[in-house]
């Protein structure tokens, strides 16, 4: 592919990039940019540590290899989550009624699905607003929206999975199912669950305009 004309393209996976660690998530790349800006301008680098909770969240949620820098960021990010999380993240944790120390598993199976539900069911901007908002009242509002989105996502997912199981051809070596009524934001999760159930290559798609 042809790279766009830009002042800079930050991607450690580029062929000519000599940055030693290639497996940062997008948020990790953003954090490196912020860190470089602070260093270049003689600012207090410790101020960037306030983002470690969000960096840990993104690193775990993106399922990047938990090695090298990713492991370090997650370790210190989880410490911040358990000691002094951002108010948006704290609001989500309370929604999940977590009382013990938050772990990477809590992010993977609790917090990340809440955040992802915004993009699946309504609009991802609601998750962004939650994470950057500083007003407690507004944070609670966005947190409620994300929680409701996730509950709706669970219901839709269950219904689609049940329908997909009925359409499944048990004799086939592959599994291809579709419907014009299936929510496009949820079918990826359903496909993963079908693979877990049948151990076969699986395609799940939502039909639109006859396709």
Which stretches of residues belong to each language-model region?
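Hydrophobic alpha-helical transmembrane segments in multi-pass membrane proteins
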Residues: 2-3, 116
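Short alpha-helices
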Residues: 3-43, 48-60, 68
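Hydrophobic helix-and-loop "lid/oligomerization" segment in the mid-to-C-terminal part
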Residues: 38-211
